[in-house]
Amino acid sequence: RFINTAALAGLTVGVAACNDKPAAAPAAAPAAPAPAPAPTAHAGANVHLKPGELDTYYGLWSGGHNGDVRVLGLPSGREIHRIPCFVPDALVGWGITNESKAVMGTKPDGNLRYTVADTHHLHASYKDGNYDGRYAWVNDKINARIARIRLDYFVCDKITDLPNVQGFHGIFPDKADPVDPAINYTTRVFCGG
């Protein structure tokens, strides 16, 4: 009996709430104007861009088990481009053409040495302590490889196998030569185990 009464009361309230007429407000003194909302840190940022509008920034993200690098526009988050590195990509012919097979590495029979990867930790090159936009590197955690990406064309142009390593996870380029202060750009990429 209690459940039936509660169900009937809920149904009555639900039907009453569906009324299109606004409820009559009691006559009262005019209320003070509502305070303006406090500005937030991202109040001016609009993440929706109309067709033809360009993003302010572009970011590079590792693709994980896809074995590629993603170029994303910011603030929209749109995927602008995929840069295949360690895994074949039939859409652009990566791993299928002779040129890309030469970069990826092949077995004596001409087949690719590896067809799986796990990209992590993308880093760009430096000059004068700032990013110079020349190269980026990304590592393949599964097969102990590192790929270099030319940032003028957004293509992978070199893959290096690291001997005697299994599962290295992080990489970081140097900002300057530690011995010669005249060399103020990236000359090496360090890999952490």
Across the structure, where does each feature detected by a protein language model lie?
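Beta-propeller domains
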Residues: 68-105, 138-163
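An edge-strand/N-cap motif at the start of beta-rich repeat modules
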Residues: 51-62, 70
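Asp-box/WD-like beta-propeller blade repeats and closely related beta-sheet repeat scaffolds
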Residues: 152-193
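N-terminal export signals
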Residues: 1-20
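Structural signature of eukaryotic scaffold interfaces centered on beta-propeller domains
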Residues: 39-54, 94-132, 171-186
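Bacterial lipoprotein signal-peptidase II cleavage site
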Residues: 18-28
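Conserved beta-strand positions in repeat-built beta-propeller and related beta-rich domains
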Residues: 61-64, 130, 136-142, 181-193
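Post-signal peptide N-terminal segment of mature Sec-exported envelope proteins
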Residues: 13, 26-49
